[in-house]
Amino acid sequence: MAREKAQILDKDGIRRSLTRIAHEIIERNKGTGNLVLVGIRRRGVPLAERLAGRIKDIEGRTVPVGILDITLYRDDLTTLAHQPVVRSTEVPFSVSGKIVVLVDDVIYTGRTVRAALDAIMDLGRPKLIQLAVLIDRGHRELPIRADYVGKNVPTSSREEVSVRLQEIDGEERVVILETAE
Amino acid sequence: MGLIGKDLIGLRDMPAERIKLILDTAVPMKEIIRRQIKKVPTLRGRTVVTVFYEASTRTRTSFELAAKYLSADTVTIAAAASSVSKGESLKDTARTIAAMGADAVVLRHPMAGAAELLARTVDAAVINAGDGAHEHPSQALLDLFTVREKKGRLEGLKVAIIGDIMHSRVARSDIWGFTRMGAEVRLAGPATLLPPGLEKMGARVCSSVEEALMDADVVIVLRIQLERQQQGLFPGLREYARLFGINRERLRLAAPGAVVMHPGPMNRGIEISPEVADGLQSAINEQVNNGVAVRMALLYLLTGGGCRK
């Protein structure tokens, strides 16, 4: 069983991080023209929706939000203990020529992001793809780097970062769990 | 072992939650079919072998497309022309499949029980694509999927299956599938084509087509299998059309907006009139499309992951 080692972010911490990321997205892209957000299932989805809400508060413009399920793009199906259930990808707009901001809760090995990049490419040809994550915990296995990071958290590979969001988990915090050897 | 077990032999013993998982998985698969680039890398490096001892372009192509959309490699063994005896031929087939290192085998065979026999012989996942007059589970699953998509549910629906029940493996799988998911199944057809024991399967045998159609939400019209009609089980095609054919007048007995389905290929003007086959209530073309999505779901769930071997 995993033991809770430390809390990295509380409710206010998550809120502040997302507000900062929203500002950074607008600033780097000089506004919201051509911008779309795509959340990676599951916890990337509420985060993308929240970012869209912040961007609307700041710029007064609604940015489209899509949902990406990357199960069919994973390269590790044979090594997983449990074969994951496939859920829907819902990107009801064209990504071609757009600035796509992929949103996820944690970046770790980079394999999820790689799968998400493949999935996005199959939907069209974006002008640019950027990556926003709430937590970067290191240990990359692929040359992938996030453009927007809520918080960098150095972890050991025995630890696990658990992002708990109101929409899915009924609470708002980020904790480090330590798994027993 | 896949999410739904090693093989798919039939729906007779499949629990409702497993059927639901297959139908739920087919929803995102359908989204992929609608894309410009109909391909995902999920089954890259896997091999799917289709072995058809009976000709069936529709089902075979559907499975092949499903495998290709998931990036699996496909090999076809056209055994339709061979007439070797069952035991020998299946053993030979099993040897070939083992040698090919197949991950999944799709088998169509004229003898009931062939798929089960093969499943016990090979390590690969075996999918029954029709064995004699026994079962045709992937067709029934696509029927369930199409109805659920059209009606939003399966529970409580009235499903009429009309025609040659005796020779129809689709009918058998449909009866198991629809009743398992909480629908009411009524059957009608020539008395000579209604085998005994249908009530035990949970279906209601009606004395007339009209009785079966009354307020039905779904009408599944079965093909008169002309190739199996050498025994004279009904007087003639014209009489069949008059007594059992689904035409516009008969369809009015069904509930408004009832869905009409047919496993194909159709004998237009015999079991189904052209205006019904091409009418607004017909979901026959969608069935073909949904067939690929459902078969993608099956291949994913049976061979997608885990450590099967």
Swiss-Prot record, chain A:
Its EC number is 2.4.2.9. Transmembrane segments: none annotated. A motif (PRPP-binding) lies at residues 100-112. It holds the Pfam family Pribosyltran. Keywords: Glycosyltransferase, RNA-binding, Transcription, Transcription regulation, Transcription termination, Transferase. GO terms for biological process: DNA-templated transcription termination. GO terms for molecular function: RNA binding; uracil phosphoribosyltransferase activity. It catalyses: UMP + diphosphate = 5-phospho-alpha-D-ribose 1-diphosphate + uracil. The keyword Protease does not apply. It comes from the Bacteria. Regulates transcriptional attenuation of the pyrimidine nucleotide (pyr) operon by binding in a uridine-dependent manner to specific sites on pyr mRNA. This disrupts an antiterminator hairpin in the RNA and favors formation of a downstream transcription terminator, leading to a reduced expression of downstream genes. Also displays a weak uracil phosphoribosyltransferase activity which is not physiologically significant. Homodimer and homohexamer; in equilibrium. Belongs to the purine/pyrimidine phosphoribosyltransferase family. PyrR subfamily. This is Bifunctional protein PyrR. It comes from Pelotomaculum thermopropionicum (strain DSM 13744 / JCM 10971 / SI).
UniProtKB/Swiss-Prot annotation, chain B:
The keyword Transferase applies. It is an enzyme of class 2 (transferase). Pathway: Pyrimidine metabolism; UMP biosynthesis via de novo pathway; (S)-dihydroorotate from bicarbonate: step 2/3. It catalyses: carbamoyl phosphate + L-aspartate = N-carbamoyl-L-aspartate + phosphate + H(+). InterPro entries: Asp/Orn_carbamoyltranf_P-bd, Asp/Orn_carbamoylTrfase, Asp/Orn_carbamoylTrfase_sf, Asp_carbamoyltransf, Asp_carbamoyltransf_Asp/Orn-bd. One of its GO terms (cellular component) is cytosol. The keyword Zinc does not apply. Its EC number is 2.1.3.2. L-aspartate binds at residues 86, 169, 223. PROSITE patterns: CARBAMOYLTRANSFERASE (PS00097). Carbamoyl phosphate binds at residues 58-59, 108, 136, 139, 264-265. Heterododecamer (2C3:3R2) of six catalytic PyrB chains organized as two trimers (C3), and six regulatory PyrI chains organized as three dimers (R2). HAMAP family: Asp_carb_tr. Catalyzes the condensation of carbamoyl phosphate and aspartate to form carbamoyl aspartate and inorganic phosphate, the committed step in the de novo pyrimidine nucleotide biosynthesis pathway. Belongs to the aspartate/ornithine carbamoyltransferase superfamily. ATCase family. This is Aspartate carbamoyltransferase catalytic subunit. It comes from Pelotomaculum thermopropionicum (strain DSM 13744 / JCM 10971 / SI). The lineage of its organism: Bacteria, Bacillati, Bacillota, Clostridia, Eubacteriales.
